[in-house]
Curated annotation (Swiss-Prot):
UniProt KW Lipid biosynthesis keyword: no
Glycosylation sites: N36, N72, N139, N202, N286, N297, N332
Topology in the lipid bilayer: Single-pass type I membrane protein
Domain notes: The Ig-like V-type domain is involved in homophilic interaction in cis, a prerequisite for cell adhesion. Ig-like C2-type 2 mediates neurite outgrowth through binding, induction of phosphorylation, and activation of FGFR.
Ranges for region Disordered: 399-486
Transmembrane segments: 355-375
Disulfide bonds: C51-C124, C172-C226, C269-C316
A matching Pfam family: Ig_3
Cytoplasmic-side segments: 376-515
Protein name (record): Nectin-1
Ranges where the record places region Interaction with FGFR: 282-299
Family: Belongs to the nectin family.
Record's keyword terms, sorted: Cell adhesion, Cell junction, Cell membrane, Cell projection, Disulfide bond, Glycoprotein, Host cell receptor for virus entry, Host-virus interaction, Immunoglobulin domain, Membrane, Phosphoprotein, Receptor, Repeat, Signal, Synapse, Transmembrane, Transmembrane helix
Amino acid sequence: MARMGLAGAAGRWWGLALGLTAFFLPGTHTQVVQVNDSMYGFIGTDVVLHCSFANPLPSVKITQVTWQKASNGSKQNMAIYNPTMGVSVLPPYEKRVEFLRPSFIDGTIRLSGLELEDEGMYICEFATFPTGNRESQLNLTVMAKPTNWIEGTRAVLRARKGQDDKVLVATCTSANGKPPSAVSWETRLKGEAEYQEIRNPNGTVTVISRYRLVPSREAHRQSLACIVNYHLDRFRESLTLNVQYEPEVTIEGFDGNWYLQRTDVKLTCKADANPPATEYHWTTLNGSLPKGVEAQNRTLFFRGPITYSLAGTYICEATNPIGTRSGQVEVNITEFPYTPTPEHGRRAGQMPTAIIGGVAGSVLLVLIVVGGIIVALRRRRHTFKGDYSTKKHVYGNGYSKAGIPQHHPPMAQNLQYPDDSDDEKKAGPLGGSSYEEEEEEEGGGGGERKVGGPHPKYDEDAKRPYFTVDEAEARQDGYGDRTLGYQYDPEQLDLAENMVSQNDGSFISKKEWYV
């Protein structure tokens, strides 16, 4: 009804707009009959058909308002309003049609108790003088809400081994709808649906959907819902399937820890069946039950302490009206009880161990890397820079105090190297030396020695901190009876040849040198 009212309001505004357009546009002084283009209503409800007349010419006189229905190319009068004769409603509408506000400009009527036969084209006509009749048409659609329901099959659904044929399990019906409904199914079942439409003589449509599937134990107690969508309405109704099937048998009670002298143990036969199992039968794979074992319906009791004789395969057969099925369990007997460690306990114990192991491994890896770096730096610092040539060992510059043993001079911060060395450079002190040098005065003194600064004669030699063995021997012959820092001694030479100079100023034996 709210939607019909909204459509009617839209029609009135549309008609008013047309009337104003006809009135204000130059040259358009035609009379306009305003109606809704289309209307709809449901069977049994009321519908209002709007009609009004826009008369831009005051000189035009309205004499009558008439409602007609088009039927098979002809017009059938329904209701008439005449200012002189009043309102007249013709059969079969005399009890169903009324003018709401009868006047020269408003011919709106109400049609009550809609029937399917009311659907069609309606005409609103205004008789005017002297311009003649003016009319407009509207289309009325009558809708029928369907009746919906779902029903399960009356046949008994039975699941049988090897069955492949689908059977009807439910039917969903949406009857006497106009227009027809949309029917669907909502379920987890793996079936299929088929649809059928039946057009009734009165113009309505009945939609029927049938759902089929292969009966199975899994389909038992599953929900099957029928969904009907019609216009703005949604219908949903469901049912629960009842499928009969043979027993599905399992045996409970054996926990894998049956040991000698254990007591109070039993086996229970569980049968999933529809209808429920009514009979249980216990046996063993060898035939009869062992001594001390007693069957009571679906329970098997073990009397007394457990012995090795109770080991074996136990079978339970369950029977219902559909059939008989069996299940079995193998019982093993151990000498001593077994207490398994809970899974969560093992996991909890493993977690700290894994964490500690990871941390320890990381620390060890860091220590190894740091140690490797330190060792590499030490080796690089003490790497041997000399050579094993016996011709170029370091002995000093050949100058020292007479009678004072030669000492290795300290290293200077700034270093220079001999120009005549073609091998790797050997470091030596820069500048002059602090050694005492002697000089003979020319022309007097008879060999008198003076102690003072270095003689110019020795400046060049003093700048050379090192000499080779050959150079040292030559210089010894040249200086005669001068006192040299180097005294040729085969034992000392042998000792010197076995010594190696290091960058930090120390000497080590070749026999002890290593990298």
